[in-house]
Swiss-Prot record:
Subunit structure: Heterodimer of LeuC and LeuD.
The EC number(s) this enzyme carries: 4.2.1.33
UniProt-recorded name of the protein: 3-isopropylmalate dehydratase small subunit
UniProt-recorded Gene Ontology molecular function terms: 3-isopropylmalate dehydratase activity
Keywords: Amino-acid biosynthesis, Branched-chain amino acid biosynthesis, Leucine biosynthesis, Lyase
GO BP term, pick one: L-leucine biosynthetic process
Annotated organism of origin: Pseudomonas putida (strain W619)
Length: 214
């Protein structure tokens, strides 16, 4: 998993509340068991004018020019600004996979659905909760200032605006540790690799009948 320490990136404003996981990555794209290939279909029903299908050549599909991610000024955005209850709906880890592969490192919103919130941390995507007032002010500033960037410092738990104002956010200490060090569930387990090997060795010696090759 990619570590997250500090990031400065262009902000794209998604001015919609209650964005659910089927809108983030529609159900027809969930057939793949790989973690890659979802970025081109992020917000598929909003980005394109036709109905997308798996393994389709998206370069030939008609774009919805009114959708924010298709605007020239937001090309290359790596911070998504959203409204309340982002990531609601059914549980699908493909949602943070799609956001990550598109290029987003963080999503800022007043609130998130619990499962999406948890899945994001496990996949290197930082969800940041700010107050309604702070988010509203960010929407106004992004709209008024092309090329608007934010700097996110995870260690300091701070979001710095271009005008120098700092917005602080809360994060669980364990999740912070994992993101700073790029540790997903597998990475955490592998930290105890030697202890696991030692236990397995003792277990095999004490109960050899449990192992076919003993």
């Amino acid at each position: 998993m990619k570590a997250f320490t500090q990031h400065t990136g262009l902000v794209a404003p998604l001015d919609r509340a209650n964005v659910d996981t089927d809108q983030i990555i529609p159900k027809q794209f969930l057939k793949s068991i790989k973690r890659t290939g979802f970025g081109p279909n992020l917000f598929d029903e909003w980005r394109y004018l036709d109905v997308g299908q798996p393994y389709q050549d998206n370069s030939k599909r008609p774009l919805n020019q009114e959708f924010v991610l298709n605007h020239e000024r937001y090309q290359g955005a790596s911070v998504l600004l959203a409204r309340e209850n982002f990531g609601c709906g059914s549980s699908r880890e493909h949602a943070p996979w799609a956001l990550d592969e598109y290029g987003f490192r963080s999503v800022i919103a007043p609130s998130f659905a619990d499962i999406f919130f948890n899945n994001s941390f496990k996949n290197g995507l930082l969800p940041i909760i700010l107050s309604d007032e702070e988010v509203e002010e960010l929407f106004k500033q992004v709209e008024a200032n092309p090329g608007y960037q934010l700097t996110i410092d995870l260690q300091a738990q701070a979001v710095t605006r271009p005008d120098g104002k700092v917005l602080h956010f809360e994060i669980d200490a364990f999740r912070k540790h994992c993101l700073l060090n790029g540790l997903d569930d597998i990475g955490l387990t592998l930290q105890d690799g030697e202890a696991i090997k030692a236990f397995e060795g003792k277990h095999r010696a004490a109960q050899p009948w449990l192992f076919r090759d003993a």
